[in-house]
Amino acid sequence: MSTYNHREIEPKWQKYWAEHHTFKTGTDKDKPNFYALDMFPYPSGAGLHVGHPEGYTATDILSRYKRAQGYNVLHPMGWDAFGLPAEQYAMDTGNDPADFTAENIANFKRQINALGFSYDWDREVNTTDPNYYKWTQWIFTKLYEKGLAYEAEVPVNWVEELGTAIANEEVLPDGTSERGGYPVVRKPMRQWMLKITAYAERLLNDLEELDWPESIKDMQRNWIGKSTGANVTFKIKDTDKDFTVFTTRPDTLFGATYAVLAPEHALVDVITSAEQAQAVADYKHAASLKSDLARTDLAKEKTGVWTGAYAINPVNGKEIPIWIADYVLASYGTGAIMAVPAHDERDWEFAKQFDLEIIPVLEGGNVADAAYTEDGPHINSGFLDGLDKAAAIEKMVAWLEKEGVGNEKVTYRLRDWLFSRQRYWGEPIPIIHWEDGTSTAVPESELPLVLPVTKDIRPSGTGESPLANLTDWLEVTREDGVKGRRETNTMPQWAGSSWYYLRYIDPHNNEKLADEDLLKAWLPVDIYIGGAEHAVLHLLYARFWHKFLYDLGVVPTKEPFQKLFNQGMILGTSYRDHRGALVATDKVEKRDGSFFNIETGEELEQAPAKMSKSLKNVVNPDDVVEQYGADTLRVYEMFMGPLDASIAWSEEGLEGSRKFLDRVYRLLNTKELVTENSGALDKVYHETVKSVTEQLEELKFNTAIAQLMIFVNAANKEEKLYVEYAKGFIQLLAPFAPHLAEELWQAVAQTDESISYVAWPTYDESKLVEAEVEIVVQIKGKVRAKLVVAKDLSREELQEIALADEKIKSEIADKEVVKVISVPNKLVNIVVK
């Protein structure tokens, strides 16, 4: 039989693994531990697409490899199952989001199992399970006790259509919501915040210890955004009021010609003159409709309004006008800036637009034409004149501190984490607000605070979550008769995913989040694979919670994930017209090797793009598994290119991977397997073991598969195959194509045991060199023969072999041999006359 039947083999082995608990996490204390973690998915209604298995296959290959190397392997899977889509679906259909979520999880699990991943399902977690979110709530109560969870009246990104506020990170650059693309408006609301800023310095510094892609570390550094500079206090003319600005360039204070406050700044209404009151009020309203991202877009037109008030520049006593402008955010820094238009592009554009004074304080450039943003000696700066940047900053900070009008200051771009959502489908926040004005956390003995089941999950309309409608759940009375009201906000989806990797370590513990000894044994996670889109949010939040738990003594390590790897994106086949617009695949036909728009007849260019329903180019893994088999999908996704590259899906590539597996099947089913080693495959076999082992360590799965192909080609040229090499090859194949490998192992090793824990093959360094070499035989300097001989023969042995060769014998039959020159491993030159 020339091909194998994947429809028979794959379900057979999946059933075997499940029945035998083959992938139960090892607990042998004499073995090293290896923790391979996937970013767990949100179980959407659409199910898996072929992008999901790329990362999952990578961790699965490593897990199977490490088991064979004698490690205890923790390789778990779970569900990040709270979130807006389930709630939106429930509102649209009237169904319970819990039912919808359970159906989706069952479908995801079916699809994942069909791909042959070696998960330990005894450790499955689900963020919506009360036994799980009991500990999410417990972490929150600890944050609350330590003052790191607090309530504040803050301007939030309110999305009317979603009935909830969303975090800054969930607002797109165009000012719409990441989920749904709805308009986002700013409005002040009582919100729960987590004080992630208390950990800013540690979150920044500890990045140095991590084996993460530098690009991800840079994104976190930029998000944390550490700046060293000075706070400067400006008094407001004719009042007893003042405001503080933070600047990284206090040395340019002599060039500050106006100040700008955020429209939401507390002083705006106090200092605005009667003449400017209406203009200021109108501007404040307009600013409230924009997201932070839209307001700070560098490309947008500069807008602003003068308040009618003046500030006093502390260094020279000059009166400078105070404006409001939406590019200054109340939530960033002090909500006020000093503007030095000569040396800042945004300030320069603003000054030009509103005809404000521009005074150069650094030499170089022509500030009439553009802001000069390079460095140079100070000018127009009194006691700083002639100094360079570093010396001038130091001198100005000393002056500010001496005069009592400023001080050195470190600030961070990082804001505290907006932690509440006005939705139903999330973890209830375990806080009770009492009528006497106090608030307390729900005691640990009463956790979990279970989300009540209700059919009425529409937003309350008051800005509170639907939980505000459930009075039986909402209202509580203390033993002393004081009445209270439960917190109605729920936690964001990020909560459950900030610590799930800890629960996998001890998922059934009812007494604590996880056992200390087990945490010590498994942390930090050895390899975490997932999409780069989680660079800032999830990874930063998880690091914050981990550090907090480290401070509590709950976890033994400072960081959760030692090595992080981002797989690339699998792109779909798509087509562009002459305008660059994408055309859905069902509107395209292929003629004579070219592609055409069925409706317009226009020839189209093939161009990979992100898979999407609208382009009708989403590939469902169910279809691939049915037609080609799970092993083919696994091998193809690992062979299509480097794991971190984004590559277009190709049906031809898929067929190529299947053909390779069929060749493997034929080789091991038709070739005579022998117990005596002829030595013919020594070099290629040992090279293959060495190469595949090294490439697995480096996550270079495509080159590992290429080496397996080299071995198959070499083995096919031989009449017989040494059985030990056949077995070793099957072991090397097993992490990539586990079903086929199990089937072949049974036949070749003549066993009914799984291959999963068979010791990984080793290679012999001495076999990596050629046993034979090709030498040339020359007569009078001309090549007359090429001979394959044993390596490292002596000069005498080479001479003997050359002179005994039939062809050479006939060439020199009637000639006298004058001299024979032999060079070992290279040539024999025969001089005749």
Curated annotation (Swiss-Prot):
Reaction(s) this enzyme catalyzes, per UniProt: tRNA(Leu) + L-leucine + ATP = L-leucyl-tRNA(Leu) + AMP + diphosphate
Protein origin, superkingdom: Bacteria
Motif ('HIGH' region): 41-52
'KMSKS' region (motif): residue ranges: 610-614
One function term, GO molecular function aspect: aminoacyl-tRNA deacylase activity
GO CC list: cytosol
Keywords of the record: Aminoacyl-tRNA synthetase, ATP-binding, Cytoplasm, Ligase, Nucleotide-binding, Protein biosynthesis
GO terms classed as biological process: leucyl-tRNA aminoacylation
InterPro entries: aa-tRNA-synth_I_CS, aa-tRNA-synth_Ia, Leu-tRNA-ligase, Leu_tRNA-synth_edit, M/V/L/I-tRNA-synth_anticd-bd, Methionyl/Leucyl_tRNA_Synth, Rossmann-like_a/b/a_fold, tRNAsynth_Ia_anticodon-bd
PROSITE patterns: AA_TRNA_LIGASE_I
Major subcellular site: cytoplasm
Family label: Belongs to the class-I aminoacyl-tRNA synthetase family.
Name under which the protein is recorded: Leucine--tRNA ligase
